[in-house]
């Protein structure tokens, strides 16, 4: 009995120490916003109370191109594209709900329909009736869903490693299972976030190493991944309210 009590006490002590070591508080919104806004950053409030961060850059007289980022990313993903395309095109980017400087929204709706409403609200706010719509990964899924819902508004689609229909996704997963283990593994963060128990405690943990692994995996371990890039993902994830 004494051994059991000692074991339990030791386990509790280890868990407490681990919790203290792994705990990371949130960063104030004002601090993160000041660092990651630019002179072209704008905010507007949707009817549901969501405060949306977006940018309207490039040639204002050129064709409008709306670009939608992927999961766990932000509009900063498109900054290199703005530099390349901005001379000839008007480039609109935005942070979707639960992402970037938009963060949490009052109605707690973050699914596909909420994403479509956000895109539509941004272009409506800017008075844009027709545009080219593009996105990568999750943003690609937003792109083709929005095009199906509003074909009269979209002049062309740009799909970059887009998420697809469920049956296509299942086929891709089957193909992935045939690849080498180190190539097929999903980023640790995405795997863990599928588990309810982890989601419940994730908001209290320091996400740095998970973020670093996830970014490297998402970028296929490209030399483009710098500490500055990792820090951006990390600090945006720690923005107050983003982990709720």
Tell me the role of every PLM-derived stretch:
Residues 1-63, 88-89, 129:
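Alpha/beta-hydrolase fold catalytic core
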Residues 37-40, 45-47, 51, 74, ...:
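Catalytic domains that recognize anionic headgroups
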Residues 45-49, 55-57, 96-138, 142:
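Active-site loop/oxyanion-hole signature of alpha/beta-hydrolase fold enzymes
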Residues 50, 56-101:
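Conserved HGGG/HGGXW glycine-rich cap/lid loop of the alpha/beta-hydrolase fold
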Residues 77-79, 102-108, 168-170:
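Conserved catalytic-core motifs of eukaryotic protein kinase domains, centered on the activation segment
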Residues 79, 120, 144-148:
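Short, hydrophobic alpha-helix immediately C-terminal to the catalytic nucleophile
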Residues 84, 88, 125-175:
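Conserved hydrolase catalytic core segment
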Residues 153, 158-244:
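Flexible "cap/lid" subdomain of the alpha/beta-hydrolase fold that forms the substrate-access gate
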